[in-house]
Amino acid sequence: MSGIGVLREGPLHAALKDYYARPGDRAEVPFGRFVIDLVRADGELVEIQTGGFSPLGPKLDALLDHHRMRIVHPVAAERRILRVDDAGELLSARRSPRRAGALELFDRLVSFPSLLAHPNLAIEVPLCREDHVRAPGPTRSRSGRRTRDPGERRLSEVLDTVVLDGPADVAALIPADLDEPFTTRERGVALGCRILLAQRVAYCMRALGVLADAGKRGRAPLHVRTQRS
């Protein structure tokens, strides 16, 4: 079977599975050649995906046409960086200045840019307060090279959630007062996100039919909305 098993899941995945579980749900359910994180009493399949979406490809290909599915993808809206020693004792703690929102989803959605057009799929983005637990400093690989410890994500609190249930919900992410046509940079400023993320948002929105090309201003491509929220 393929899928994330209980023995392999990280603390963030486990905590979110508990958070989303409802009375009557079944957890870690064998489903054909896959394992599903949660199967709702009404038949909806819930997959909690803390990393990239590419590993979900075979599961989506096999199941999405015949089952309602919900992908839960957490975003660390607020985070603390905790440094611990080999015994797990806390050495230091600091709050990260980085703040993130639901748009971070599009860093992952570029793997399947038109995914949200499928009528059986919803993506839910819990905006979380997290602790990122890391080693005291850089670690070394077997070859002796210094490597950055990716750490371990732990859930402290779910602050809010954003649900995208189709292209119309994606269109609603574009600020209503943004003048058209607009460049990717202008949309990034309006959304308050970095230019690379704005480019990925544009890529996915074009694939979903939410944006259309509208020529260029100098060398910068222009876009217009194709639907309103």
Stretches with model-predicted labels:
Residues 216-229:
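Short, cationic-aromatic polyanion-contact patches
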Residues 206-217:
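A short, conserved structural fragment
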Residues 36-52, 56, 63, 69-71:
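Conserved catalytic cores of phosphodiester-cleaving nucleases, focusing on short active-site segments
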Residues 192-207:
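Short amphipathic alpha-helical interaction segments
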Residues 1-35:
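Acidic-basic catalytic patches of nuclease active cores, encompassing PD-(D/E)XK
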Residues 93-165:
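Long, low-complexity, charged/polar intrinsically disordered regions in eukaryotic proteins
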Residues 178-191:
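Short acidic, hydrophobic short linear motifs in intrinsically disordered regions
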Residues 59-121:
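A basic- and aromatic-enriched beta-loop-alpha substructure that forms the phosphate/nucleotide-
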